[in-house]
Amino acid sequence: MENIIVTQVKSSIGVKKEHRLTLHALGLRKTGQQRKHKVSPELQGMLDSVRHLIKVEKA
């Protein structure tokens, strides 16, 4: 499995509740915060739903 680093680049203020909950599930609570995750189909779906709020890099 490949690892990726997910960084929150935009605030969650004013976004849909579902997007805030997705960010929280990814472990992102503040702008600039980073988390390392293993790639999976479930994770890919979560990343696609909040792609306008995050940046994804290979680890």
From Swiss-Prot:
Which top-level group of life is the source organism from? Bacteria
What InterPro entries does the entry give? Ribo_uL30_ferredoxin-like_sf, Ribosomal_uL30_bac-type, Ribosomal_uL30_CS, Ribosomal_uL30_ferredoxin-like
Pfam family, any one: Ribosomal_L30
Biological process per Gene Ontology, one example term: translation
Q: Name one GO molecular function term.
A: structural constituent of ribosome
- The answer to whether UniProt assigns keyword Lipid biosynthesis to this entry is no
Q: Which UniProt keywords apply?
A: Ribonucleoprotein, Ribosomal protein
Any Gene Ontology CC annotation: cytosolic large ribosomal subunit
Q: Does the keyword Ribosomal protein apply?
A: yes
Q: How does it assemble?
A: Part of the 50S ribosomal subunit.
Family that this chain belongs to? Belongs to the universal ribosomal protein uL30 family.
Q: What is this protein called?
A: Large ribosomal subunit protein uL30
